[in-house]
């Protein structure tokens, strides 16, 4: 009886939510709303860096091991072959750093479909450790989303944007994906992009400008894209990219940092995540293209405003790279007048974000690092001279009706490095001697010493600094509504609201609200007035890791509630209310040991089902909870 009751309740809830989310009709006569059947919306998922499976498209015999590579064998990520046949695995992963072609003996290509982004290394042990979008898709199924309504658009995350289009026609295919979704389901799509996937989507929007006649560009966007959720977007780059370039980042894999560096520097996409200055812009290729004259490559350089040279560190918290290089050669006369200590004293050079993006760093260490020439080649050919636009320039708000920028915050994040020669041959010729972290209110070194710099009250998500994540706050208008609410389910007693907060363009906006200790909050910055017919929102999730944010149940709950709110013709506000958050699923119910009953008695009840192993597992949504979403209108 218990099992049947659970099945009936679960089915009833799913059917109810399916009707509410997917079957609603809109009658709102507002330009920001999609006019039509919301059951016809599609979801387009663009994964981040290293978040798509790569499969072999070669036959490679690996000596000294029975594990060879055959067509469609998993390459990224197969830890078994990585451990037993690392040289073969390396050949299937590496690219030529100059022309981005495959290794002569092995080539890999991105997998397709949703399975390519759910688990990178499927298996009983490795699967849970390499999960990316699996939990996201579980929510889609639980809330009754149709299988053809969610579309993944994997890509070869090793390539630069120009090579993605040149080799795979990726952006042509992405355009067709949007058009197919519209034709198949009859409505526009919602874009979910994570990490570098946002860079891919931004490039697509700029590429689309040159693909579609200017007078049809905005119309195409309105017809095909209802909302854009930018999750963990490195809008001004990530310092980990330059760390990977100089010393290698292993991502916890059983490879040396030198091997990781060789791979990373063969991928031109590593530079796509390079930090850059908010004060420097490139030529507007769009207007040059339609003005009748082709832009000269030698003129497509950075143009920086006065603030770049008046402010420190290109607006970042500190100099991103501080590197020791051997002293320059001196004449014999000068050598006589120098002590041995002075003669051996290395030179410490510091570089800002602008000096990383324009190649100054690589030119300075060109004589000491064999990778510098290759990096300069990639930087100029694939980014500075990109035929669409220079991706290493600050973002403007995408011309989409509804934009939601979402990221984690308040975690200790790397913002700068000290490098020195290691005395070892390439690729291990640099060693990190110190790391600078941003903490709330200060910058500290790896040893805990306070460092001078532009420290802010908010920090990043452990991977991308706050300065880069929060750039989207510049997309908000002069008046912003701020709401801070606890991340867990709550009754509204700890919700803080400030309306019409002044926001000066170019400056940060921070919620000046008191937080209870040991409580994680989510802060909403919302603006629906500054741009007629458009909505912009920024969500800051406390203590949410960059790589895990797409698995956050809090994020998924808020996303579904916002979409549920949007489909309601009787919605009284532009954004879903934050006044209260109750359980939405059986998994949200739990046992309150202090009261010896299920928490949230209004929504949950104790209902044992065969196989339950603890009290909390027997707490389930009540049969009467099907109308619980009505409070969010």
UniProtKB/Swiss-Prot annotation:
InterPro entries: AB_hydrolase_fold, LACT/PDAT_acylTrfase. The keyword Lyase does not apply. GO terms for molecular function: acyltransferase activity, transferring groups other than amino-acyl groups; phosphatidate-sterol O-acyltransferase activity; phosphatidylcholine-sterol O-acyltransferase activity; phosphatidylethanolamine-sterol O-acyltransferase activity. One of its GO terms (biological process) is leaf senescence. It is found in: Microsome membrane. Signal peptide: none annotated. The chain crosses the membrane at residues 7-29. The keyword Lipid biosynthesis does not apply. Pfam families: LCAT. Its EC number is 2.3.1.-. SUPFAM superfamilies: alpha/beta-Hydrolases. Residues 30-633 are lumenal. It is an enzyme of class 2 (transferase). Its main location: membrane. This is Phospholipid--sterol O-acyltransferase. It comes from Arabidopsis thaliana (Mouse-ear cress).
């Amino acid at each position: 009886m218990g099992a049947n009751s659970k099945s009936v309740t679960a089915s009833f809830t799913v059917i109810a939510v399916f009707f509410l989310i997917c079957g609603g009709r809109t009658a709102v006569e507002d330009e920001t709303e999609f006019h039509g059947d919301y059951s016809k919306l599609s979801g387009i998922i663009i994964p981040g860096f290293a978040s798509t499976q790569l499969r072999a498209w070669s036959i490679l015999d690996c000596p000294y091991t029975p594990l060879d590579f055959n067509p469609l064998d998993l390459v990224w990520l197969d830890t078994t072959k990585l451990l037993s046949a690392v040289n073969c695995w390396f050949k299937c992963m590496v690219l030529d750093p100059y022309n981005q072609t495959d290794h002569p003996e092995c080539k890999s290509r991105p997998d397709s479909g949703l399975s390519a982004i759910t688990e990178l290394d499927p298996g009983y042990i490795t699967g849970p450790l390499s999960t990316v979008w699996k939990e996201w898709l579980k929510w889609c199924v639980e809330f009754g989303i149709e299988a053809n309504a969610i579309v993944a658009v994997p890509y070869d995350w090793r390539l630069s944007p120009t090579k993605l289009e040149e080799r795979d026609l990726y952006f042509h295919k992405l355009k067709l994906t949007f058009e197919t979704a519209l034709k198949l389901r009859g409505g526009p799509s919602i874009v979910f992009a994570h990490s570098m996937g946002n860079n891919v989507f931004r490039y697509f929007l700029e590429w689309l400008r040159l693909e579609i006649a200017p007078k049809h560009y905005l119309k195409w966007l309105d017809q095909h894209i209802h909302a854009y959720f930018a999750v963990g977007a490195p809008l001004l780059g990530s310092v980990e990219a330059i760390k990977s370039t100089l010393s290698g980042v292993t991502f916890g894999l059983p490879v040396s940092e030198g091997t990781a560096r060789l791979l990373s520097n063969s991928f031109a996409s590593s530079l796509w995540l390079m930090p850059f200055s908010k004060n420097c812009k490139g030529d507007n290729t769009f207007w040059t293209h339609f003005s009748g004259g082709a832009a000269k490559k030698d003129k497509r350089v950075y143009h920086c405003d006065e603030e770049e040279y008046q402010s420190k560190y290109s607006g970042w918290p500190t100099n991103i790279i501080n590197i020791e290089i051997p002293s320059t050669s001196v004449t014999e006369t000068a050598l006589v007048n120098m002590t041995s200590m002075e003669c051996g004293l290395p030179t410490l050079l510091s570089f800002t974000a602008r000096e990383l993006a324009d190649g100054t760093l690589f030119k300075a260490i060109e004589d000491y690092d064999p990778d510098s020439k290759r990096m300069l080649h990639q930087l100029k050919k694939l980014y500075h001279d990109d035929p669409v636009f220079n991706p290493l320039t600050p973002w403007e708000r995408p011309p989409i009706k509804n934009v939601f920028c979402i990221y984690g915050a308040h975690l200790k994040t790397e913002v700068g490095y000290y490098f020195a020669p290691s005395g070892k041959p390439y690729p291990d010729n640099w060693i990190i001697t110190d790391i600078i972290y941003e903490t709330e209110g200060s910058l500290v070194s790896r040893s805990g010493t306070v460092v001078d710099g532009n420290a802010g009250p908010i920090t990043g998500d452990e991977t991308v600094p706050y300065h880069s994540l929060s750039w989207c706050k510049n997309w908000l208008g002069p008046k912003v509504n701020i709401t801070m609410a606890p991340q867990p389910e709550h009754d509204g007693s700890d919700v803080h609201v400030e309306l019409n907060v002044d926001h000066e363009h170019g400056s940060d906006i921070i919620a000046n609200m008191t937080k209870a200790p040991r409580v994680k909050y989510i802060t909403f910055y919302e603006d629906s007035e500054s741009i007629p017919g458009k909505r912009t929102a920024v969500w800051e999730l406390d203590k949410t890791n960059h790589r895990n944010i797409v698995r956050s149940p809090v994020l998924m709950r808020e996303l579904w509630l916002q979409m549920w709110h949007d489909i309601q013709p009787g919605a009284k506000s532009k954004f879903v209310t934050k006044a209260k958050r109750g359980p939405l699923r059986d998994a949200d119910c739990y046992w309150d040991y202090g009261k010896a009953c299920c928490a949230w008695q209004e929504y949950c009840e104790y209902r044992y089902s065969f196989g339950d192993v603890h009290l909390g597992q027997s707490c389930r949504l009540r049969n009467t909870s099907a109308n619980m979403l009505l409070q969010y209108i």
